[in-house]
Each structure stands twice: as C-alpha cells, then as structure tokens.
Amino acid sequence: MRLKELLPNFLIVHQEVPEDPIAFKSTDKRENENKEITIPELIDTKVPELADGATDTLYGLLVNGHLQTAYGSFRHFDNIYKVQYKRMIIKYPHGGEGTVDFAVNGRSTKRRKVEKEYVPTSQPVFNGNLKRRYSYYSPDDPKLNSDDAKPMLIILHGLTGGSRESYVRAIVHEITTKYDFEACVFNARGCCYSAITTPLLYNGGWTNDIRYCVNDLRKRFPNRKFYMMGFSLGASIMTNYLGEESDRTKIECAISVSNPFDLYNSAYFINSTPMGSRFYSPALGHNLLRMVRNHLSTLEENPDFKDVIEKHLKKIRTVRQFDNLLTGPMFGYKNAEEYYKNASSYKRIPGIRTPFIALHAQDDPIVGGDLPIDQIKSNPYTLLLETSTGGHVGWFKDRSGRRWYAEPLCRFLKIFHDEITVKGLKPDLENVQLPDPNCEPIATTFRAN
C-alpha cells in the first residue's frame, strides 16, 4: 500500500453493477452480430477515472465529507467555470411559470443600443453582476427553435439552487466548451432569480414541470438527442421522472449525482449527526425560508398557506419542519413523512428504461450511505458509482473549485453519444430480465384520464 492511499483525501471508485447489464448493439444484420457494448465496458475502456477500483486524490485540506460539502457553500467560485445564460420562460398548462437557462458561451449576446432588452412582465430585471451573466430570450427569438442535430444536456439543480451554482456551471462549461454539446438548466419554480406566478413551489417528486419542459424542448429541437443530469433534489426529480416515463423515455442517458434516493431516511440522517442538526439542516431550512419570503405575496394568495405562514414561518428552523408545514400540505400530503415516503425516487428505479448512472460519495453528510443497491443491481439499465470520499455534491480537486466529476462525466456523455446514439445501437433485451416497471405512483403526478 502506498502512503497516499492512507490519506483521508484519497478517492477510490467502486461500481455496483447488475449481473447482466444492458448491452447495446446494432440492429443492422450486416454488422457483426457479436459486436456489442455495455455501460460498464464503455466506462472501463473510455473513461477509466470512473472504472471500478479507479483512484484519485482530492483537495488535501478537505479531509472528509463535511469539509468537501461545506467548501461548496462558503465560496461561489466565480472565477472558474464561467458561463453566460439566456433565459426562456415556460408557461405551464397546469398553471404558473418556469425558467430554462441556455448556455450561450462564446456567442454574441450584445444588443444594439437602440434595441431595448426584452424582460418578461412577470419576471424580475437582471441587475448588477447578474446582468453580465443573464439575459432573457424573447418568445419569438429564432434561436429557440432549430433543426440542428447537436446533442443537448438538460440539468436539474439541487434544493433552492439553479443555473448559477458552481456544481452546475462545472458541467455546463465542460460539456459545451470541450464536447460540443448544447446545455440548458431547468430551474425549479421560484429558484435562481425567477418569480412564481401562482402559489405553488416544487418538491422532490414533482415531475409535471420537467415532463412539460422536455416535451417542449423536443418540439423546439426535433433533431436533437437529449441527455439529463440531476444534482441532489434535482436528481430525485429526474429519477422519479425517468421511472414514470419508463419505456416511453425521451432521454438517451441520464446521470444522478448525490441523490437522496430515500427522502425519509435522508431527513432522519441529516438530523442524526451534530453537524447535520446544527449546520446542514438549519442552512437548508434558511434557504427554503428565503425562497418563501422572496415570493411571499404570491404564496399568500392561497389562504391556507397564508395562515400557515403567518402562524409558523418564524418558528421553522429545519427542512423537515418546512416540509411538514408547507411542502407537504402544498402538494396534498398530510405531513412531511407522507410526502417523503411517497416521493422517494428509489421506488421508481425499477421503472427506469434509460441508461442511468448514479454517482454518490460514501461520506455524504446530507444523504448518508444507505443506498438502493439492490434496486440498482436488479435493473440492467442502472449502475452505481460509489466513491470513498467527496461529500455532498463536492469532489473538489483543488482550492480553485475544480470538480473531480465534471470532466469524466462529460466525456462519458460525449462517448455514449458518439459510440451508441449516433451509431444507432439499441439495447439488446433478448437475454435480460427487467424488473416490473409498475412502481408506486407519485400522488402529485398528472395522469391522462
């Protein structure tokens, strides 16, 4: 054993792989019938950083999951992974508005002085430093529709986050500048400097908005192939969505990062440690309260929420308290416990029919290390990558904020696109046993009559 392997910042990758992972092969009978490839094989041959037993060294001063996690909260890392966005407004048919931020790095976003910059009447003006990074698309902008065939990555952020988060920008910057992908970030309601227009926010099982967003993007860009990556609560939403869509999937491949697969267990775990109960949970609760205060006038249009806000808002200190009083009842659940148990994304893993990779650090201080390994190993479409360290959406390589996962994950998506999607390889289902896709339904998902 080498000395560096004894260091607490030494990272080791461990894979949890189904016994018979899905193999992709050509449907053209003229091709060599034996020529096929699985996701683990693709990783081992093309992305060795993610192979089983791969090693690396993270930032030496961040010697555990707590420090890796906290470092991402204390700094914004504005000098690295710089991204410019243009924002599209989505008007949901089920009420309210959402926003999608498209990466436009390297493209001219300047307007002539005589041309007034478009700002939707329902949304805030970007001022100060935000104005350098964000602007709005007008609804009739021709760039919102294209016949090009470039691959596009859709990213879902974590709790109260958005396209501005450094963990999101790391992926957006890498995949657009190095791998010729288009990228956009789906901002949840009320997040990332966006205004809500109805008294409704979102939760870890609310898949209606992302479903509408994906369908809308496919209409705008009919020739593109779509990929997904979700972080933390965004990974929960993404996993639930993919499990519900099952073999109707419109996504070529998806990656889940630091997913709280079991919301109930995660809520318990975060409050079971001194750091969790004294720092993480109050910090996340503070972010949720700030989001509510930013949209207070609209939320109070619902008299039930107005009553709760007036009576309890000042008493809320943790995520669980927030979900018990606001999130749960807002979406028809009796309390936080009922919401957590119904919306936990591990329940939708059996329904996934999209090539799916989950990345998780064993020292994640927010989610914990209790992962749905049995469910993942029972689905030939899914694969788990566990690292010995990295924290919750951390994996910092150095002081500058460089992330260990950004380059290899983006390279994997590029290789998957080139070697499987573009070549038209299809999953060989002849000799695999798929789990029953009929998962427990999410109570809040809209269903056709």
Swiss-Prot record:
It comes from Saccharomyces cerevisiae (strain ATCC 204508 / S288c). The gene is MGL2. Belongs to the AB hydrolase superfamily. AB hydrolase 4 family. Its EC number is 3.1.1.23. It holds the Pfam family Abhydrolase_1. This is Monoacylglycerol lipase. It catalyses: Hydrolyzes glycerol monoesters of long-chain fatty acids; 1-hexadecanoylglycerol + H2O = glycerol + hexadecanoate + H(+); 1-octadecanoylglycerol + H2O = octadecanoate + glycerol + H(+); 1-(9Z-octadecenoyl)-glycerol + H2O = glycerol + (9Z)-octadecenoate + H(+). Keywords: Hydrolase, Isopeptide bond, Serine esterase, Ubl conjugation. Converts monoacylglycerides (MAG) to free fatty acids and glycerol. Has a preference for palmitoyl-MAG. Does not play a significant role in ethyl ester biosynthesis. Also possesses ester hydrolase and low but persistent TAG lipase activity. Residues 151-392 form the AB hydrolase-1 domain. A motif (GXSXG) lies at residues 230-234. Optimum pH is 7.0 for MAG lipase activity. Active over a broad pH range from pH 6 to pH 9. Optimum pH is 8.5 for p-nitrophenyl palmitate and pH 7.5 for both p-nitrophenyl acetate and p-nitrophenyl butyrate.
